[in-house]
Amino acid sequence: MSLWKKISLGVLIFIVVLLASVAFLVGTTTGLHLVFSAANRWVPGLEIGQVTGGWRDLSLKNIRYEQPGVAVNAGEIHLAIGLDCLWRSSLCVNDLALKDINVAIDSKKMPPSEPAQEEEESGPLNLSTPWPITLSRVALNNINIKIDDTTVSVLDFTSGLAWQEKNLTLKPTRLQGLLIALPKVADVAQEEVVEPKIEKPQPDEKPLGETLKDLFAKPVMPEMTDVHLPLNLNIESFRGEQLRITGDTDLTVRTMLLKVSSIDGNMKLDTLDIDANQGTVKASGTAQLANNWPVDITLNSTLNIDPLKGEKIKLKVGGALREQLEVGVNLSGPMDVALRAQTRLAEAGLPLNLEVVSQRIAWPLTGDTQFQADDLKLKLSGKMTDYTLSMRTAVKGQDIPPATITLDAKGNERQINLDKLTVAALEGKTELKALVDWQQAISWRGELTLNGINTAKEIPDWPAKLNGVMKTKGSLYGGTWQMDVPELKLTGNVKQNSVNVNGTLKGNSYMQWTIPGLHFALGPNSADIKGELGVKELNLDAAIDAPGLDNALPGLGGMAKGIVKVRGTVEAPQLLADITARGLRWQELSVAQARIEGDIKSTDQIAGHLNVRVERISQPDVNINLVTLDAKGSEKQHQLQLRVQGEPVSGQLSLTGSFDREAARWKGTLSDTRFQTPVGPWSLTRAIALDYRNKEQKISIGPHCWLNPNAELCIPQTIDAGAAGRAVVNLNRFDLAMLKPFMPDTTQASGIFSGKADVSWDTTQEGLPQGKVTLSGRNVKVTQTVNDAPLPVAFETLNLSADLHNNRAELGWLIRLTNNGQFDGQVQVTDPQGRRNLGGNVNMRNLNLAMVNPVFSRGEKAAGMLNARLRLGGDVQSPQLFGQLQLSALDIDGNFMPFEMQPSQLTMNFSGTRSTLAGIVRTQQGQINLNGNADWSQIDNWRARVTAKGSRVRITVPPMVRLDVSPDVVFDATPSLFTLDGRVDVPWARIVVHDLPESAVGVSSDVVMLNNDLQPETPQTASIPINSNLTVHVGNNVRIDAFGLKARLTGDLKVAQDKQGLGLNGQINIPDGRFRAYGQDLLVRKGELLFSGPPDQPLLNIEAIRNPDATEDDVIAGVRVTGTADEPKAEIFSDPAMPQAEALSYLLRGQGLDSNQSDSAAMTSMLIGLGVAQSGQVVGKIGETFGVSNLALDTQGVGDSSQVVVSGYVLPGLQVKYGVGIFDSLATLTLRYRLMPKLYLEAVSGVDQALDLLYQFEF
């Protein structure tokens, strides 16, 4: 074999072995595992926990990768490739899933990267794939990426795509739980702080006019060729839920739907639907990135941002970007505005026609209107190089008189000429003509004219008539300005006082002023300013001579006179002042006399004196007799004394000091200081040493103490307050008796507090100050008067603490009640300026509710034990709570309770942003089971639900109502609505309503309730609306005894409440009953109450007939009541039918008009019946006096057999009844004894004797 053949054979064998090795490593499961094992071993920082499966079902778990500045942790990566597709020249990925991925990148720790080389332009990008690529499913679950201070989290993402040639299709995609936390701009700016530079205009810098001229000399939209996108993209459906971006602003998108496609430059937006916390957006449209770039976009939005909450926006964009573009905007809601605009972006000069129209614009947008503009019309037409502007509107407001505003102007890129701005108001006109030019510097020239202004109608207490003119001109350039007022003139009168203002002045930004003369005169009062504040010389005089300020302005009074002079030079100025005022008053403030006198010079040192004396300062709750301030000396040695005499504060202080100009340092001493305050006198125990160093911007305050009879506050060591420093404050004693002047009479507090505060700060470093505050109470007792009864609360231990260290704030407390339980806990906030994570715990141990028993009446009490072990979590925006709160052995006995409560319990379990409620309310008869849950995972959209179920719970409202209820109700609560639904069964009830007093009268429907200020009370409405939908079922054993009616009730009512109010729907029936009226015993034959709306307006359908046993001739006579409760209609009826007079006779007498009985006997029987009917309560009270219960006087029988019957209970189960005939002397004695609740033994003795056994049925 030749050498060439050997070499060729060796190369061939090597290639075959290499290809076989690659095929083994890549194409087999074993080889693939070997590749990952090698990577796990040889790749620095890589660690793979587990590898299973092959290319068809490959799973990598517990992957870690770490490099400087980069840390990656992956829980699981799954890849499934369809190898069969390779035979069809396509690539198919059946599944690509990433789960529990955490990536942390710190760019500061990463090695610097090499500068990127500039890539040469290679023409338009064209993306195309030679083989079809299909990704059936890509899924991301629990992905967290942090890059420096930016965090991106994805809860769940699923999608898929198909790519063939240039066509890329994104399959239906779902994204849930996206959070992008951006750093706040202030934090970034603080890290990248740069010393500001003041840039002065450069000689070659273009003026604003030239810049605008160059801008509009060419089209705003440059010449553009057709745009060819590298891909044809089709997004079939992209749905997002709970997408949130935080930072300087917080944006939460609840739901989002996007459908869009782009084919050969033709873009089509089928659907864009966004529902966010700031509002909703719906958009659709088309656009073409070629030819003239036509567009057609429609957008509709509803805002949910104060004050534009509820504002609806409709935007329409049409036309073409390179031809005429038309934009229309309609706003409706709190602000109604219509805007129409046409422009040509591809034409030089930017042609623009803009029109804004609004019938009404008000501010604020919600609530009471303070400003309003009606019929607003604004129009701008032309080009930016030559345009006209006009505006018309009428305005009014709370403090603004009605006015009509007219504006006409012309302008170009160099200037705007305000032809006329007219404000027609107050019976006159205010006109402004001006020219503003920015071709070189920004300069202006204008004239303001007042003509015929009259305020008599708008301000009748301060009428004024004014005319005037002011001319002004000036310029602004490079941060400096200058202004010249060549003419200022104002004439007229104010409340019969002549007004005269005239003068001229000029000045600049260097505070150099030349004032030839300014004169102000109002009636006899005048003020003059004249002089110059020049570059070197200072010579300015100001004088005031106001002998009659009374009513010159509303609420102003008194007199004032004085002069102020400025002399010297800029390097050595001198200020002299001498001002005197007497009888000054402004609104409710009055000063009897004031004097200011001073002479201050500044040469190499500032020296002089200043004396201020103010006598009798008075206003509500303030009465100061005298205030004096004396300051004198020089920089090297000066002193100040302040004296105050009066109420509520009086006292004095003395301050001495010296200033070193070279060192820019002031040293002083505060001494002889004491004040009298409403909480007692305060005085310094030692002088305070003060030291201010201006170069360091730091002040030192020496140790001292403030002493009060009930308190002592001390600074034990020197405080250096500057950019950095530390302060320690000790509260050695604080008696709560000091608070008595500020507490209501119903509250009393006693005890001693002591504490300490230690705070340090350093503004040159990032983060918050450091500090700790502790407060401890001894013998603390608070007594609150509730319902004229004292409620004392004594504290055995009362400790409070607050700590701020290492970017963590902590608040702790320990409260032990005397002879009671304990309440303690701590709340921690980590990173208060950033994430504000919460931590800590709250504990309650054996808190006994018996502590409130003193406020209960005799025989009433409360019992129960409250315990809680709670733990805080989450952050301030989304707080979390864990643990349990339990109220056990709860028992409240009181007349206000509708049932007799037995020991009950209530338990609440908290698990993060959710909680559950379980409880049992036990009563003497029956119990109520409570269950519920709450969720505050969305703090602005929390919800709570409580269900109550019970069986025959006895409810008692003495002395009228006893009933059994079986509730099955559900109460739901959200921030916007309370809802009560369910059913309440009343199987048994006894309702007894006593007669109203004869003097009782109903409340008039037009009554108006007044408050303490004699103003009508505003009806209180619930801040959150309440909707109810309850069904009340009245069972077969419900009886009522009210106003002579004894009856049984049945029926069903539906109780509904909404924003319209409370309403009842349903029917109450009266199956049987009796009604005592007019001395007669009427039987309810038919009774129906129909409810359909307000509860006080039922429809009545009632028939009550006379007892047939007491009516002759088998006649049925009665009363029929129909109509509404407020307008009932009553009529008498009979069976058989007969005239009304005959029916009335049978109703009242029990017999007809043609009866053989004498009229006197009939009249006697009727009158006795009527009299007995009116004396029932009087007889009952007499019986109670003699120990006979339920003593009653009644009539029985008809005609000659009528009797007067007296009955009563002499023993709890023994009833005695005695009857005497009205027209004969026959008497009947009846004894009835109750053997069992419904079994009676009755003995009757009269003309006949009888012994009966009676049993009572109810059906």
From Swiss-Prot:
* Transmembrane regions listed in the UniProt entry: 7-27
Topology class, membrane: Single-pass membrane protein
**Annotated keywords:** Cell inner membrane, Cell membrane, Membrane, Signal-anchor, Transmembrane, Transmembrane helix, Virulence
Could you say what a knockout of this gene produces?
Answer: Significantly reduced survival in human serum, probably due to complement-mediated killing.
Subcellular compartments: Cell inner membrane
Leader sequence range is none
Record-level GO cellular component terms: plasma membrane; TAM protein secretion complex
Q: What is its main location?
A: membrane
Q: Does the keyword Isomerase apply?
A: no
Q: Which residues lie on this side of the membrane: Periplasmic?
A: 28-1259
> Origin, by domain of life?
Bacteria
Cytoplasmic topological domain ranges are 1-6
One Pfam family from the UniProt entry? Answer: TamB
Record-level GO BP terms: protein secretion
| Its biological purpose | Component of the translocation and assembly module (TAM), which facilitates the insertion and assembly of specific beta-barrel proteins into the outer membrane. In addition, is involved in outer membrane lipid homeostasis. Likely transports phospholipids between the inner membrane and the outer membrane.
The similarity annotation says: Belongs to the TamB family.
Question: Quaternary state and partners of this protein?
Answer: Interacts with TamA to form the translocation and assembly module (TAM).
Name this polypeptide is given:
Translocation and assembly module subunit TamB
Q: Which gene encodes it?
A: tamB
